């Protein structure tokens, strides 16, 4: 049996005291040797953590002590190795960032569709199926005939809706994401924009892969996950993807065989994205990682977070430039 339980969880619920919850929650995670990241905001909790079976059970039991979190939505999968390096509880404005004020899934949300009813819905020719995830996630796998909004971050989703969807034309819209949380907000947003029939996959892709037999599945490819496994197959097992530690994008064995791949420094997707100075820093970091591994330690550097933030800013700037060009025309 796999050694670690990977638990993805969330709940939209009023947590006016979310700042006070941070410390005791951190203590529970650390006391049970649970790693991963949980986000707290006034609108609820979200995140993915991993630990031994008894540790995750202890965390879920801790949630039950607070009536607001007692029925937190969670999904489990398993892995032979701990997929996280650190334990973090972060305070945020939103537990999933859309950047639109007033969207509250607790009050208005789309219609939930069970995994075993999903195939029938998305086979309806009158339904437009929209993948609410980012483009690098869609590249790895998605549902048959799903529309890719080509978003780099979830913040761009409202603009996609404004530019491409019309409540008068698109009468039935079905949406899905990894675990369900992004669809809670995206369907709430769609309802606010006047879309009447808005559906979303209850429990997300992960629940669908868990419950729908592969021979009946309309899922194509693997599913990107936000932990060290990078992606999972239909059996919810780690698939053949790795991650480039320079750009943090998923890469295949073919990518790693490329002349543009240098472990920890570059891959075909980012070879032209970083300066020589940055690459020199990445090489030094990779050297330290290898030294730490040789000592049986875990090296946690600051470059990864910096790169993720930088990549988001660059892509947002590019999107803004594209939109400005459209308006100018």
Curated annotation (Swiss-Prot):
EC number of this enzyme: 1.14.-.-
Pfam families: Rhodanese, UPF0176_N
Catalyses which reaction(s): uridine(34) in tRNA + AH2 + O2 = 5-hydroxyuridine(34) in tRNA + A + H2O
Family matches, as InterPro entries: Rhodanese-like_dom, Rhodanese-like_dom_sf, TrhO, TRHO_N
Biological process per Gene Ontology, one example term: tRNA modification
Encoding gene (name): trhO
CDD domains: RHOD_YceA (cd01518)
Keyword Cell wall biogenesis/degradation included in the entry's annotation: no
Region (Disordered): 285-329
SUPFAM superfamilies noted in UniProt: Rhodanese/Cell cycle control phosphatase
HAMAP family to which the protein is assigned, alphabetical: TrhO (MF_00469)
Catalytic residue positions: 177
PROSITE patterns (alphabetical): RHODANESE_3 (PS50206)
Name of the protein in question: tRNA uridine(34) hydroxylase
Family statement: Belongs to the TrhO family.
Basic and acidic residues compositional bias, start-end: 296-323
NCBIfam families, per the entry: PRK00142.1-4 (NF001136)
Role according to the record: Catalyzes oxygen-dependent 5-hydroxyuridine (ho5U) modification at position 34 in tRNAs.
Sequence ranges assigned to domain Rhodanese in this UniProt record: 123-217
GO MF assignments: oxidoreductase activity, acting on paired donors, with incorporation or reduction of molecular oxygen
Species this protein is from: Vibrio atlanticus (strain LGP32) (Vibrio splendidus (strain Mel32))
Keyword list, A-Z: Oxidoreductase, tRNA processing
SMART domains per record: RHOD
